[in-house]
């Protein structure tokens, strides 16, 4: 099974569908997908890190791997992008493929309660959400992304936490992401 080998051997929960696991168990598959997009003409490729944060990974019992999933996902995409640039240069061309670090909405909402009988209940705080996004953003930057892509978020508080985390990651960096 592609999902539950390597660091996930003996996982207590079903991991199929947790695509970020593939960054650690089958990086060659993820890289091949990036290369297909590049070969088709993509100038920007997204990392396989949409749910590589400890909140989303807690659904699978994989929260301890979230940072590693994000970093490795970025490094795989960076490698594919750099190889495309090298290949172009070998025939006298210049090509830049940008790597966008995918940051999804997490599996939890800060604005809505998952418990209809307790509308004030929230399983996570704003600070928890901020920490999840901060860890993910830092790992993506360290892995080599050019862009941080906060995507498909429907919850304004989740977006606010993500933007605060990304902004704080920029502090002290010479190069803006």
Question: What kind of region is each of these model predictions?
Answer:
Residues 1-177:
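Domain-level signal for soluble alpha/beta catalytic cores
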């Amino acid at each position: 099974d592609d999902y539950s080998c390597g660091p996930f051997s003996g996982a207590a929960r079903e991991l199929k569908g947790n695509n970020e696991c593939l960054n650690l168990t089958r990086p060659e598959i993820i890289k091949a997908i990036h290369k297909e997009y590049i070969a088709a003409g993509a100038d920007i490729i997204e990392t396989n890190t949409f749910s590589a944060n400890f909140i989303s990974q807690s659904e699978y019992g994989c929260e301890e791997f979230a940072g590693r999933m994000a970093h490795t996902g970025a490094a795989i995409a960076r490698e594919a992008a750099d190889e495309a640039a090298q290949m172009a240069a070998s025939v006298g061309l210049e090509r830049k493929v940008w790597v966008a670090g995918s940051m999804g909405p997490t599996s939890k909402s800060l604005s809505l309660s998952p418990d209809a009988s307790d509308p004030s209940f929230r399983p996570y705080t704003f600070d928890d959400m901020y920490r999840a996004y901060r860890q993910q953003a830092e790992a993506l930057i360290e892995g080599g992304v050019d862009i941080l892509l906060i995507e498909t978020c429907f919850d304004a508080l989740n977006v606010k936490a993500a933007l605060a985390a990304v902004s704080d990651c920029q502090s002290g960096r010479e190069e803006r992401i």
